[in-house]
Amino acid sequence: MWYSHQPDENRASKLIGTKVVNTANETIGDVNEIVLNKDGKVAAMILGVGGFLGMGEREIAVSFESLRMNRDSNGNLVISVNATKDSLAAAPQWRWDTTRK
């Protein structure tokens, strides 16, 4: 029942706001939300993309399996996705289903 964290684990609360880069190491956005499935496992991350200083940003959903988490040379968490800025700009905008509780 009791749990001890493992060295390679991350706290979900610390993922919000984490920078997201593409494979060319271009910053493409940041993490706005984390979506859990019915079993409590991470299904997707909602990324804020395309904005500047919080203006004009839109949200897209990216499956958790398509994201990679690594540490930079300073030990900071960086999330990466194999996508171009153009493909993310063309991604459908995420909208929460407001009928769900």
Residue ranges, per PLM feature:
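Peripheral interaction segments used for macromolecular assembly
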Residues: 1-101
